[in-house]
């Protein structure tokens, strides 16, 4: 067909393109979901058991999408001793829109001012919770294209998930993840193995430009999420089976071939149901299911149709039970951030990846295939996979990325819990002020984590000014350094002390390529 390569053609790409480094940011305070149940007057366990949520992170009016992304980017650059001139592409995935024209990416360029690096491609990508994954694919495609200049790509996924008072509010959260993409990575994107499904649906959307709150069709949203998973998994299985056949292996792909399986997580219970859903797909596709012990007791469901089972409690219960061991082995650990911080929209699935990397050693991760299901309402979804490098030696890229996340649980534990009424007051404050001009935020600066960027003011022309809460390493800085405003050329951010040049030319050498709340 037009545009396709001949079967005998060889394409060349940089070697092992993938995730080189990962940084995650979440706010310094949370509300306990058990306490929120009491405050909301609902049955005990509705949020903690029914949704599977323990705590929900939130931010005051001191933080917005720009400050979240500035924080996670600068943290990644500093923790990895990177120079700002080693970034050649920067793209943001978000659905938290505070300006209909100016991108979050352009705000992030303030961090690059001192380096003088303005030659950075990419802008923002938006489709509910899928924008981060679309940005990741764009980054990979850039590195594997003739446009690549040998530098890293940086992807930022971040959101503030807030809901009006009611059943959906406990499925909120806040967070941002930054992913450094490049060759010779410890987490490698498997080429040709993406199963994508896109369709038109009004399951979750935000048409009101004056409100942060979405319009949600809860039942439709659950159906859309699960049906997209069915479609994506089916396409992925066909593609990897075709690859295996070329290698002389005719076995069918199943859940057992994933070392880990992570999901976009609006709430933890949906993720558990989703893994069970994948087992249902395996069951229906297995011509020898009677000989497989994992399907023992499921014989009665041999003739069900996938499209008839989205709300079938008997099917759901049976396959959740049958997949319980698989869930414990492959998915449960990925829910650390989701359970403790809530839904982070575009960054949710990458928070799940961070959770896995934080809880397993390089030796336990080496060689594993990580399945990744990304979903965004409206809708767009992809199931793809990462292959972990085999090199788990001390000082290896895999050792470095896991070491950088080893403090994830302690960081979550270091947050401050606040009473539900204080949380509600903050939500009301956001609702009343997020669109105001000539506004100075009321939230405490001292309560923020050190190194957090925050909103100083919004002027009469809606222009936003930010500052960074000092870190111990900032003691020698002059007072006022760290205050940035896009219209003041003299204000800047100090770059990391250690300068790292662009990727060496050798790295670019090619190698022959043979919910009831809305699940967005």
Curated annotation (Swiss-Prot):
Residue numbers spanned by region Disordered: 492-520
Catalyzed reaction equations: acetoacetyl-CoA + acetyl-CoA + H2O = (3S)-3-hydroxy-3-methylglutaryl-CoA + CoA + H(+)
A Pfam family reported for this protein in Swiss-Prot or TrEMBL: HMG_CoA_synt_N
Pathway(s) the chain acts in: Metabolic intermediate biosynthesis; (R)-mevalonate biosynthesis; (R)-mevalonate from acetyl-CoA: step 2/3
Residue list for modification Phosphothreonine: 476
UniProt-annotated binding residues for (3S)-3-hydroxy-3-methylglutaryl-CoA: 43-44, 129, 167, 171, 221, 264, 273, 343, 377
Compartments it resides in: Cytoplasm
Gene Ontology biological process terms, A to Z: acetyl-CoA metabolic process; cholesterol biosynthetic process; farnesyl diphosphate biosynthetic process, mevalonate pathway; lipid metabolic process
Positions with a binding annotation for CoA: 44-46, 167, 221, 269, 273
GO molecular function: hydroxymethylglutaryl-CoA synthase activity; protein homodimerization activity
Transferase listed as a keyword: yes
Sites bearing N6-acetyllysine, chain numbering: 46, 273
Coiled-coil spans in chain: none
Top-level lineage group: Eukaryota
Residues bearing the modification Phosphoserine: 4, 495, 516
EC number from the UniProt entry: 2.3.3.10
Chain's role: Catalyzes the condensation of acetyl-CoA with acetoacetyl-CoA to form HMG-CoA, which is converted by HMG-CoA reductase (HMGCR) into mevalonate, a precursor for cholesterol synthesis.
Assembly notes: Homodimer.
Protein name: Hydroxymethylglutaryl-CoA synthase, cytoplasmic
Annotated source species: Homo sapiens
């Amino acid at each position: 067909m037009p545009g396709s390569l001949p079967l005998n053609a060889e394409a060349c790409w940089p070697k092992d393109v993938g995730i080189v480094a990962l940084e995650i940011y979440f706010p310094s305070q949370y509300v306990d979901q058990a306490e929120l149940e009491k405050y909301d007057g609902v049955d005990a366990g509705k949020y903690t058991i029914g949704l599977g949520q323990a705590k929900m992170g939130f931010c005051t009016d001191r933080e917005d999408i720009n400050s979240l992304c500035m924080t996670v980017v600068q943290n990644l650059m500093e923790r990895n001793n990177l120079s700002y001139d080693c970034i050649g592409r920067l793209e943001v995935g978000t659905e938290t829109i505070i300006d209909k024209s100016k991108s979050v990416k352009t705000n992030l360029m303030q961090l690059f001012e001192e380096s003088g690096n303005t030659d950075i491609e990419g802008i923002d990508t938006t489709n509910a919770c899928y924008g981060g994954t679309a940005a990741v694919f764009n980054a990979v495609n850039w590195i594997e294209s003739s446009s690549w200049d040998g530098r890293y790509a940086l992807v930022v996924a971040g959101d503030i998930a807030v809901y009006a008072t009611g059943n959906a509010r406990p499925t909120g959260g806040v967070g941002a993840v930054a992913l450094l993409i490049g060759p010779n990575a410890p987490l490698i994107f498997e080429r040709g193995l993406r199963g994508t499904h896109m369709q038109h649906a009004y399951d979750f959307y935000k048409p009101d430009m004056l409100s942060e709150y979405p319009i949600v069709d809860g039942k439709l949203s659950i159906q859309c999420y699960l049906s997209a998973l069915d479609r994506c998994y089916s396409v992925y299985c066909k593609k990897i089976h075709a690859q295996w056949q070329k290698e002389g292996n005719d076995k069918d792909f199943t859940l057992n071939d994933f070392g880990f399986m992570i999901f976009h997580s609006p709430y933890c219970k949906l993720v558990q149901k989703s893994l069970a859903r994948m087992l249902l797909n395996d069951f229906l596709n297995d011509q020898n299911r009677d000989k497989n012990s994992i399907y023992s007791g499921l014989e009665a469901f041999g003739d069900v149709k996938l499209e008839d089972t989205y709300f079938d409690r008997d099917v759901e219960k049976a396959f959740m039970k049958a997949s319980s061991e698989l869930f414990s082995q492959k998915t449960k650990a990925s829910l650390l951030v989701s359970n403790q911080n809530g839904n982070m929209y575009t960054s949710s699935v990458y928070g799940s990846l961070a959770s896995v990397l934080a809880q397993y050693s390089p030796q336990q991760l080496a060689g594993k295939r990580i399945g990744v299901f990304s979903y965004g309402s409206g809708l767009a979804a992809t199931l793809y996979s990462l292959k972990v490098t085999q090199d788990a030696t001390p000082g290896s890229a895999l050792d470095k990325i896991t070491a950088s996340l080893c403090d994830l649980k302690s960081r979550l534990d270091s947050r401050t819990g606040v009473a539900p009424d204080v949380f509600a007051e903050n939500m009301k404050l956001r609702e009343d002020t997020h669109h105001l001009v000539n506004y100075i935020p009321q939230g405490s600066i001292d309560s923020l984590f050190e190194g957090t960027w925050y909103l100083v003011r919004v002027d009469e022309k809606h222009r936003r000014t930010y500052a960074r809460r000092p870190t111990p390493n900032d003691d020698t800085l002059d007072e006022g350094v760290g205050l940035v405003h896009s219209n003041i050329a003299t204000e800047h951010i100090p770059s990391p002390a250690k300068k790292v040049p662009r990727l060496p030319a050798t790295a670019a050498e090619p190698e022959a390529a043979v919910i009831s709340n809305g699940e967005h």
